[in-house]
Regions:
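Aromatic (phenylalanine/tyrosine) cluster motif
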Residues: 6-7, 16, 24-27, 32-33, ...
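Phosphate-binding site recognition
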Residues: 50-486
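Active-site metal-binding core of divalent-cation-utilizing nuclease and nuclease-like domains
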Residues: 215-220, 506-533
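Acidic-basic catalytic patches of nuclease active cores, encompassing PD-(D/E)XK
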Residues: 478-512
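Conserved catalytic cores of phosphodiester-cleaving nucleases, focusing on short active-site segments
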Residues: 498, 522-526, 535-546, 558
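Nucleic-acid nuclease catalytic cores
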Residues: 548-552, 559-589
């Protein structure tokens, strides 16, 4: 309960028609009394005032109520301060359009929604926003004025109209030693505030939250909106405690499923709802995840248009930002950026890996080191820029049940370490920020020569710039890996090896596979980024069981450099061959001379 206290010099007749009791006392030999607000006076109803002597000081203590009599609580009808801080921040991207969707589903069969996203993708901000909009404990009209939702016809209809319960399960978990204690704390805290708001309602069981809400609804027809943040923290903290997980799911089912008093239920977390075979605890929820966010895709992260506006304001290169933080793609929205990383980049004015501020690479290492056939090879293929097919249907939405490589890859989608294309059911590493996380994880893992090659890739790139052909060949040899599904027997497989050997080149170049130019397609072309125009462009041609000199000759004959005319005079031709018999890589490097025709 929040209290307002103030001293007031009074005399005469003092009305207290909404007071529970009067407490008299003395302070420094001065009499005072305390007025406490409430609905049921404990005195004679005919008494409506108290006469006190002149110059008596009165300590008035009142609960923090809105003008309509609604209490503002911590869990029941919170205020809008958290969302106000977000709106007042240096960078705020308006995502209030989400409210238009939730307004469209209130009081329908689709009124239960579970939204899952990776860490730092704005889940809590969305929950705070919905709370600020629906809660009866605050007046948010001014806060939302000027934002997108204020233009919608549903804005006034639902603004601050409902008893809203907001629960951050991580907060309760941090103060609980087990799930049972957590649920007792949740019920106790919320019921206490419900009793203050509805003191006249007779409750059947004051320790049962669902029963309490049902009793209040039966007497007052009050509709509740329930917003749960970090709903899945139990599954991340108690990974192996299946019994505790089921108890938690059953609690949510009893609280939310088929209840007349639920007007809207909105849950958000990292993982989708846990599957327990035929146990359909929360099957009333519509789920929107990183696999298929549906109509909520534009609220997963920042869109292209939103990032372009930020780049213009903060004078950042959109292409660089795109390379580092873009890559999440959905049917409804083709380009989605990692919001926390974009905000950090804009505020600090420099590109970098901001992902590791939310989670260390060891979290990724645990999963890519798992012993599933094909997993390591697929990770390497994706680091090299390839996509990999995946079946997401067998994943049980927890962090311990892995039966196949597909289950591991699916978890990495939900954690944000992989992007997913719904159309062709493939996964990929979305951007350079995430790619660097994989390289960091591999560097401390037992991945043999691959780990060494990635660490030495900067030296291999430097060797190309300096024309040291034998050192380049040695760097490629280190990156040479055997796979089951990508046999090292053609130029395509060789290209994966080159991509790993030259991983460090991504810091300086935009990499193009099969780039059209002249009379055909160059195998790999490295185009310098705007910040590194002093670096030479690289045209790499690969040969299998032939010779490196022939690769250089093909670049010239087919005029692959024609599309790179602006780099004339600062262009290196790189030919690489793998001899099947000797199992030796050879390299030939030649500078494209200015006088040669492009």
């Amino acid at each position: 309960m929040r209290l307002k206290a103030f001293f007031k010099k009074v005399s005469g007749c003092i009305p207290f028609s909404d007071c529970r009791n009067v407490v008299f006392g003395f302070f420094s030999q001065t009499p005072f009394f305390v007025l406490k607000t409430g609905k049921n006076p404990q005195w004679n109803k005919s008494q409506c005032c108290v006469n006190i002597e002149e110059n008596c000081y009165c300590l008035l203590v009142t609960q923090n109520r809105r003008k309509d009599g609604c209490l503002m609580g911590i869990y029941l009808n919170p205020g809008n301060n958290k969302f106000k801080r977000a709106v007042n921040s240096d960078i705020y991207v308006d995502k209030t359009g989400l409210i238009k969707y939730t307004n469209s589903i209130v009081d329908t069969l689709q009124s239960c929604v579970c939204v899952s996203r990776p860490r730092r993708f704005g889940k809590s901000m969305a929950a705070d926003m919905l709370t600020a909009y629906y809660s009866k404990g605050c007046d948010s009209r001014e806060l939302f004025s000027g934002l997108e939702i204020a233009k919608d016809e549903s804005f006034e209809e639902h603004l601050n109209k409902y008893d809203t319960i907001f629960l951050n399960m991580q907060e309760f978990l941090s103060r609980s030693s087990n799930v049972k204690e957590l649920l007792e704390r949740v019920e106790g805290k919320v019921i206490r505030e419900l009793k203050k708001q509805y003191p006249d309602v007779e409750l059947y069981d004051e320790n049962d939250l669902a029963e309490t809400m049902q009793d209040i609804f039966a007497e007052s027809e009050c509709l509740f909106i329930v917003i749960i943040d970090e709903w899945d923290c139990i599954f991340r903290e108690f990974k192996h405690d299946k019994a505790a997980q089921e108890i938690y799911l059953d609690f949510l089912r009893d609280l939310l499923k088929d209840k007349e008093y639920i007007y809207l239920a909105y849950m958000t977390g990292i993982l989708p709802i846990k599957k327990y075979g035929t146990h359909s605890a929360l099957n009333m929820f519509d789920e929107f995840s990183m696999i298929d966010p549906g109509p909520l895709a534009e609220y997963v992260g920042f869109t292209e248009k939103e990032v372009e506006a930020l780049c213009q304001k903060y004078q950042m290169d959109i292409n660089e930002i795109k390379n580092w933080y873009d890559g999440y793609s959905f049917e409804e929205v083709e380009s989605v950026y990692s919001p926390k990383s974009v905000v950090s980049c804009m505020r600090l004015g420099k590109l970098g890996n901001y992902w590791n501020q939310t989670e260390t690479f060891e979290a990724l290492q645990i999963y890519i080191d798992m012993n599933f056939e094909g997993l390591r090879d697929d990770i390497l293929s994706m680091i090299a820029g390839e996509t990999v097919p995946v079946n997401t249907r067998s994943f049980t939405n927890d962090m311990t049940t892995f039966r196949t490589e597909d289950d591991v890859l699916t978890l990495l989608i939900h954690l944000g370490y992989l992007g997913y294309r719904y159309a062709d059911k493939t996964v990929f590493i979305p951007n350079e920020e995430i790619r660097s996380e994989y390289v960091s994880a591999i560097a401390v893992s037992d991945w043999g020569e691959v780990s060494k090659a990635l660490k030495n890739s900067a030296d291999t790139l430097q060797a190309i710039w300096q024309g040291r052909e034998e050192q380049v060949a040695e760097g490629i040899r280190q990156a040479h890996f055997e796979t089951s599904h990508l046999q090292y027997n053609d130029e395509n497989a060789l290209s994966y090896t080159i991509s790993l050997a030259l991983y460090a080149a991504r810091n300086f170049y935009t990499v193009h596979r099969e780039l059209s130019g002249g009379k055909g397609f160059a195998d790999i072309v490295y185009v310098p980024r705007k910040r590194f125009l002093d670096k030479p462009a690289l045209v790499v041609e690969l040969k299998w069981d032939k010779n490196a000199e022939g690769a250089i000759q093909q670049i010239k004959e087919k005029e692959y450099c024609r599309s790179l005319e602006e780099y004339k005079g600062n262009l290196l031709l790189v030919g690489i061959n793998y001899d099947k018999k000797t199992q030796v890589h050879t390299c030939k490097i030649e500078q494209y001379r200015k006088e040669e025709s492009i």
